[in-house]
Structure formats: C-alpha cells, structure tokens
Regions:
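Compact, glycine-rich, soluble single-domain proteins
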Residues: 33-79
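Beta-strand/loop substructures that line and gate deep hydrophobic ligand-binding cavities in soluble
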Residues: 80-108
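Short glycine-enriched loop/turn motifs at secondary-structure junctions
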Residues: 2-3, 26, 48-50, 86
Length: 127
C-alpha cells in the first residue's frame, strides 16, 4: 500500500460490484455524485479497455469538517472507488486509504473517523 491505494478482490463483475456498493451507500445515506464508465467511454471512440468504472461518493457532513481542517483535501474528496478488471479477468475494487489521506493532507487524527468507515463498506460490497 505504498501508493496509498487499497485493492480489494471482488467476485462480481465491474458493474455488479459498483451496483452493490451503491446499494450500500443508499442504505447508509451516502451520496453518489457520479459514476464514470471509463471503458464505456473508450468504446464510444473506438478504443478497447478492460471494464473500468469509477464511483464518486461522499457525505458533506463527514467531508466538510475534513476540508475545513485541510483545504487541499478537496482535491481527493469526494471519495472514489474504482472497479476494474485485470488481464486475468479478475475484478478489483480500489480506493484511497483513509490513513494515507490523513498522512498526505495532515488533517487532525480525530477526524479520521469521518472517512475510516469506507473500508468496511467496500468489504461488504465484494463479499
């Protein structure tokens, strides 16, 4: 995790993985701001790309105090989850480690709880 990115194996397809994650977010009241289908957009211009989709999500209640404490954190918020398929056709769900974001932007450790719960939600989506 030297890059700050955590990769979690998913037994579901890329679209199914993100649909599961979106359902979990809906239950928890977490906003989904956008779903970007990188591979779908590539196909529209005649390029091939393994299935790759990005979900942008967050909660102003959780994220705003973080950005007040560390304004440059806004470059990494809202949070993102990337579902992608590797060369062996295995699907992964990747996201920025909350601890890495805390280290990168230097927001107070007591605010880490505002985003730390993402790990459990990601894990639930791929089970």
């Amino acid at each position: 995790m030297a890059s700050g990115i955590i990769d979690v194996s998913s037994r579901y397809s890329v679209p199914e993985t993100l649909a599961r994650l979106q359902s979990i977010f809906k239950e928890k009241g977490i906003m989904v701001f956008a779903l970007i289908d990188h591979s779908g957009e590539a196909e529209k211009v005649g390029l091939k790309m393994r299935p790759t989709q990005l979900l942008i999500f967050g909660s102003p209640k959780g994220g705003t105090p973080l950005m007040v404490a560390a304004p440059r954190l806004a470059i990494d918020l809202p949070l993102k989850a990337l579902a992608w398929q590797d060369k062996q056709r295995h699907v992964w769900l990747s996201y920025n480690s909350p601890e890495y974001l805390q280290q990168r932007h230097g927001f107070p450790a007591d605010l880490l709880k505002n985003i730390a719960g993402i790990a459990a939600l990601i894990q639930k989506a791929v089970e």
